[in-house]
Amino acid sequence: DGIQNLTGLTVLTMFDRLITDISPLRHLTNLTDLVLHTNWISDIEPLSGLVNLERLIISENPISDIRPLAGLTKLRQLHVHGLYPNQLQYWLDMDDGRDPDVVFNGITDISPLAGLTELRLLRIHLNAISDISPLANLTNLIHLRLYDNQVEDISALADLNKLVLLWAHGNQIEDISPLSGMSEMQQLSLNDNGISDIGALGNMTEMDHLFLSDNTIEDIAPLQRLQALEVLRLENNDITDVSALAGLNQLRELSLARNWSLYDVQPLLRNAGIGAGDELDLRFTAVRCSDIDAFANRGVTLLRVTTVNGSGCPGRRLEDP
């Protein structure tokens, strides 16, 4: 009460306060930085006139309509992502008067973002978004998180060549060719999609973290030029040939678990960069126990169950990854 009189405020943080009504904030037109995450806010219309905002964090609220954001053209950072189901249940279990009938993760229309061309960071994950075409002109974006949505077509990202981080796992993406020009990419997560062709990744030579698990990838040859890779996760694909990884000497964490037909890892043994302190996951593959022991002798930390004869190597317990 009375916050509407603090018209000189430029920064305001009110998170996890069970706030439902933000109408007093409409008067705070000098705000440049506003944090309201983890409340119970559904109506963000009072924000529509806060045209000086450069950072806005309204994540983990039951917001479905983001039209009031359309005029906030100075925004450089916007967080409007949803909740994980276990988070929602946690808050409902608090029994502190929250309306249990509100809808989280309900954003479907992101067209109000189309004119926010100053955005550098955008987090819209954990929603119900299928059409990301409004992002096409946001060419200043550096960080974009849109995972756990319903996206199939990422052609709108083709000109977002400043991206260094893209997390798009948990969608229905099959064609990643629009990413081919993103030579500055450093962290890319595409787990749990429908990807088989990763040719578009071949020029991402700055990449240090790459996540491609739970797809249908057989050919990983395009990865051989990604000399900066430190973390690579390829579990649950259809990979049998790992020769492309022989020269990736910066790898410190590599997972090939659940590539059930993977047998020959000699190229990895030729990789002089894989050694003490590095982590290698070969669970639920057909890799020979003798090769697994060779990695162990180098000091590699191994998660080392195989499917040979349906059991682990001698002395090792069969366990789920």
Predicted regions and their residues:
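Concave beta-strand-loop units of leucine-rich repeat
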Residues: 5-20, 24, 30-42, 46, ...
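Low-complexity, Pro/Ser/Thr-rich intrinsically disordered segments
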Residues: 315-321
